[in-house]
Amino acid sequence: MYQIVFALNYVVLVFKSYMCAENTRNVYSQSIKPEYPLLKHGQLVFTYFHLACDLELTEAMVKSGAVCLAYETVQTADKRLPLLVPMSEVAGRMASINGAYYLQKTKGGKGKLMSGVPGVKPAKVLVLGGGIVGEAAARMAAGMGAEVYITDISLPRLRQLDAELPANVHTLYSTEHNIRKELKDVDIVVGSVLVPGDKAPHLITRDMLKEMEPGTVLVDVAIDQGGCFETSHPTTHSDPVYEVDGIVHYAVANIPGAVPNTSTAALTNATLKYALALADKGWKKACREDAALYKGLNVVEGKITFKAVADVWGMPYEPAQVG
C-alpha cells in the first residue's frame, strides 16, 4: 500500500515527518530541502512541485522512488488547470494589492495612488498574460480605479476579456513592440504568463528596465515557474522586494500564503475530491479513470513522466504506466 502525503492547503505545514504509520495521510505543503531524504519508494506525494524551475527538487524526487503528482499539471479536457485556479485567483488579486502598496514613495515606488483623485490621473497597470491570474489582477486593479492594460497571444481570449472586464481595462496583443511601448509610462507590471509544467518566458529583459521610470513596480506572479522578468529571483513574505536599476521587484513565491484563511479554504475545495479518489482507489486506478489526474504525474518511481520537465533538464522521458 502507498503512503499518501498530500497538501490540502498552500500555506500550512502540519506534520514535520514522513515517518508515520502506514496509510496515514499527512497534510503537507511543497517539499523543502531538509525533507528530501524523508521521501521514499511507496509514497505518493500530491502537492505543488514546479519541477521545471527546480533541478535539485527534480533530482531528489527521481532519486526517492516516490510517485510525485503535481497540482499544477492536473489538466481537464478543456485545458483548465483546476488545482491552479483557486491559488491563481488569490494570487492575481493580491498582485494588484501588493503592487499598489509598493507604489508608495515610502516603499520605493513612484508615490502614486492607484485610483488617483479628482483632477489627478490614476496609476497605469500592465498585466502580462490573460489567464486566471491576469484576469484576476486586471479586475482587482480596475476596481481600485487604475487604468489597466492586459496582454495575451490568444485573440479569442482577448475578445473574451474585452467583453467581460470593466471599461477601464484595455486589451493588447502580446508582442515585444506593444510591451515596450507601454513600459514608458507604466506604474505597475504584473507578470502572469503560464506555460503548464514548463518555465515561464522572460517577457521583460534587463535592458528593458531602462525604458521604465524609477519606482516602477514589477510583481512576478510566475516566479514559481522561473518568472516573467529576467531580473526576478524568488523572495519571501519577510523580505519581499528588492531593486534593480531603480525598479522595485516583488517576487514572493507563495503570494497566497499571506491570506491563509482564504487560500486554505479555496484550495481544499478544489483538491479534496482528487485526494479522496487517490486514497480510495490507489494512484494507478485513480489516474486510469481520470485523465486530468493522470496529467499530474510528473515523476513515478524514479522516472520523469511529464515531458516538459524532462525536456527542460535534458532527462529521459517515459509516459506513466497505470494499466
What is each residue range found by the language model?
Residues 21-22, 186:
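An anion/phosphate-binding loop that grips the pyrophosphate of nucleotide cofactors and donors
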Residues 25-103:
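Phosphate/diphosphate ligand-binding glycine-rich loop within oxidoreductases
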Residues 26-30, 49-50, 193-197, 222-223, ...:
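Short glycine-/small-residue-rich Rossmann-like dinucleotide-binding loops
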Residues 58, 96, 137-138, 158, ...:
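Generic hydrophobic/aromatic pocket-lining and core-packing "Φ" positions
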Residues 72-113, 122, 223, 228-323:
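Adenosine-phosphate binding glycine-rich loop
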Residues 106-191, 241:
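Glycine-rich phosphate/diphosphate-binding loop of Rossmann-like nucleotide-binding domains
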Residues 163-245:
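Rossmann-like adenosine-cofactor binding region
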